[in-house]
């Protein structure tokens, strides 16, 4: 896909200036390389995805999740179909392998957007988990960046999904149960709607985003993060929700679209005593633009349809050096 008009204009920006700035500390692992290339995935290097969480029900891994701040984890609502009692759950952070580690966080509360028993195609498959005590951030435990509510992720953008799920249909993750990663590309909504037909057209809902590999998320990856790199930091575009099988042709993985719920996330975190600065997000730059650059950026906003415009090989173009 060729560069969009927004991409062409951004290339004219002065060095070191971009449309967005990042809150320090989010989405920047100290391991710079994403590693090898979950179904069709590879073992992730230690520290590559420091926001990755393992949600466990009575010490057994049931879902993935992502750390938003020292006390909040994002996951999927359907992960809580086994119990709604917060004391039944533990959250493990900073771990590469699924082990019976004695180091874990207990859960203060679970906030669901929808019923955990919802069927595939049900909107609102997202949940927040408040930890009983804030975790200490380190090179192995860091938050992911959140998008803005108005953000979109264009078809063809290459992102990554991580988890401890099945490596293919019917095949659980083998020992040593290491975190796996796989690269996927965002699929345009109309194609995904055709791939998942239903009464009245499609079972795909507006709050859903699709991505395919050849790799894919699978059972036990639910709730885990789909992240895309923006200006050198990783931003969560979606949470693993559902799909028909794992890695099947014309059956992309379906994710809950995180931008659709950023305001919901903010509202519940602040209502529970947190501050808006208590979790990372991507604020728009408020100023410091040269007059000529300002005109270019205004034109970009008017012409662009998505947050990210892929380059010719489908990857986001980088921020200016």
Swiss-Prot record:
Sites of glycosylation?
85
Cysteine disulfide links: 26-145, 63-79, 159-228, 192-210, 218-246
Task: State one Pfam family annotation.
Answer: Trypsin
The record's annotation in SUPFAM superfamilies points to:
Trypsin-like serine proteases (SSF50494)
Where is it chiefly localized? Answer: membrane
How would you describe this protein's topology in the membrane? Single-pass membrane protein
Query: Which keywords does UniProt give here?
Result: Disulfide bond, Glycoprotein, Hydrolase, Membrane, Protease, Serine protease, Signal, Transmembrane, Transmembrane helix, Zymogen
Q: Where does this one sit in the cell? A: Membrane
Tissue specificity comment: Expressed in many tissues.
List where the protein spans the membrane: 284-304
Q: Where is the active site?
A: 78 (charge relay system), 125 (charge relay system), 222 (charge relay system)
Every Peptidase S1 domain range = 38-270
Q: Which CDD domains match?
A: Tryp_SPc
> What EC class does the entry list?
hydrolase
Would you indicate the residue range of the signal peptide? 1-19
Reported effect of changing residue 126 to M? In allele gamma-II
- Single GO molecular function: serine-type peptidase activity
Annotated Gene3D superfamilies: Trypsin-like serine proteases (2.40.10.10)
EC number, UniProt record: 3.4.21.-
UniProt family annotation: Belongs to the peptidase S1 family. Tryptase subfamily.
What is this protein's record name?
Answer: Tryptase gamma
List the lineage, top down: Eukaryota, Metazoa, Chordata, Craniata, Vertebrata
């Amino acid at each position: 896909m060729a560069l969009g008009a927004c991409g062409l204009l951004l290339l004219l920006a002065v060095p070191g200036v971009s449309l967005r700035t990042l809150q320090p500390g989010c989405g920047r692992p100290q391991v710079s390389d994403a590693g090898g290339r979950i179904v069709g995935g590879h073992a992730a290097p230690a520290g590559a995805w420091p926001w990755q969480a393992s949600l466990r029900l009575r010490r057994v891994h049931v879902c993935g999740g992502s750390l938003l701040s020292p006390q909040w984890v994002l996951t999927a609502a359907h992960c809580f179909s086994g119990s709604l009692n917060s004391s039944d759950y533990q959250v493990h952070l900073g771990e590469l392998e699924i082990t019976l580690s004695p180091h874990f966080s207990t859960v203060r509360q679970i906030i669901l957007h929808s019923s955990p028993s919802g069927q595939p195609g049900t909107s609102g498959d997202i949940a927040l988990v408040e930890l009983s005590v804030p975790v200490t951030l380190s090179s192995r435990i860091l938050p992911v960046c959140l998008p803005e509510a108005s953000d979109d992720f264009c078809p063809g953008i290459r992102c990554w999904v991580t988890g401890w799920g099945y490596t293919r249909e019917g095949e659980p993750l083998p020992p040593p149960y290491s975190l796996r990663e796989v690269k996927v590309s965002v699929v345009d909504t109309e194609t995904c709607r055709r791939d998942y037909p239903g009464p009245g057209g499609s079972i795909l809902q507006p709050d859903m985003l699709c991505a395919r590999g050849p790799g894919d998320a699978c059972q036990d990856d639910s709730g885990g993060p789909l992240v895309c790199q923006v200006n050198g930091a990783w931003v969560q575009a979606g949470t693993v929700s559902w799909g028909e099988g794992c890695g099947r042709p014309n059956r992309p993985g379906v994710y809950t679209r995180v931008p659709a719920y950023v305001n919901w996330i903010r509202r519940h975190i602040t209502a529970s005593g947190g501050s808006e600065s208590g979790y990372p997000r991507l604020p728009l730059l408020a100023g410091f633009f040269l007059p000529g650059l300002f005109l270019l950026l205004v034109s970009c906003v008017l012409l662009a349809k998505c947050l990210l415009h892929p380059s010719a090989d489908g990857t986001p173009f980088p921020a200016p050096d």
